[in-house]
C-alpha cells in the first residue's frame, strides 16, 4: 500500500503535518476522527458522551477496514486508534506508519496552552491523565515503521517525505 499513516499522542501534530504532507505528495488527506464525525453527524465529544468509548472504537475499526482498499493517501489517525484491538498491525498493512513522537513535557505545554474541549480524553487539561496515557501508549506507538521526533515542524516534514520515499524505493 502506498499510504502514509500518522500515529501518535493527541497534540502531537498528526492533523497539521497530515495536511502539509498531503499537499507535498499530492495525496488525499483522510483524518479518521473527522471521518467518524461526518459518518455520525456528531462531534467526537458527543459520540463519547452519548454512545461511549467502545462504540467510538468500533467505528475506528470499520474505518481501518475501509482504508485497506485505499492508496496514495495521508491518513491522520486519532491518538487512540493504533492502541485498541491491535490496530497498529492493521495500520502497518495499510501503509507506511509514522509515529510522531513528542516529549511528554512538550505535550503538556501544548495542552495547557490551549483548551482542548473537543478531545474527550483530555478534558480539564488533566496533566496526570496525559502522563498516564503517554506511558501506556508509547510501546505500541513505537511499533510504527519509523519514529519522527516532532518538535520542529519543517524538519519533521522533510524527514517524513525522505523516509517514505526510501521505504517505497524511490
Curated annotation (Swiss-Prot):
Cofactor details (free text): Binds 1 Mg(2+) ion per subunit.
Coiled coil segments of this chain: none
Keyword Amino-acid biosynthesis: yes
Primary location group: cytoplasm
Pfam families, A to Z: SKI
Family statement: Belongs to the shikimate kinase family.
Protein name (database record): Shikimate kinase
Amino acid at each position: 500500500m502506498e499510504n502514509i499513516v500518522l500515529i501518535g499522542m493527541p497534540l502531537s501534530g498528526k492533523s497539521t503535518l497530515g495536511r502539509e504532507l498531503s499537499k507535498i505528495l499530492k495525496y488525499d488527506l483522510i483524518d479518521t476522527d473527522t471521518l467518524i464525525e461526518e459518518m455520525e453527524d456528531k462531534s467526537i465529544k458527543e459520540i463519547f458522551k452519548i454512545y461511549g468509548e467502545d462504540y467510538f472504537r468500533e467505528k475506528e475499526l470499520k474505518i481501518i477496514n475501509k482504508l485497506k482498499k485505499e492508496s496514495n493517501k495521508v491518513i491522520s489517525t486519532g491518538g487512540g486508534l493504533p492502541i485498541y484491538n491491535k490496530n497498529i498491525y492493521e495500520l502497518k498493512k495499510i501503509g507506511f506508519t509514522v509515529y510522531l513522537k513528542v516529549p511528554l513535557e512538550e505535550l503538556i505545554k501544548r495542552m495547557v496552552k490551549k483548551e482542548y474541549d473537543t478531545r474527550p480524553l483530555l478534558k480539564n487539561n488533566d496533566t496526570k491523565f496525559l502522563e498516564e496515557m503517554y506511558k501506556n501508549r508509547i510501546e505500541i506507538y513505537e511499533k510504527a515503521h519509523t519514529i519522527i521526533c516532532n518538535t520542529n515542524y519543517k524538519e519533521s516534514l522533510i524527514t517524513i517525505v525522505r523516509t517514505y520515499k526510501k521505504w517505497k524505493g524511490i
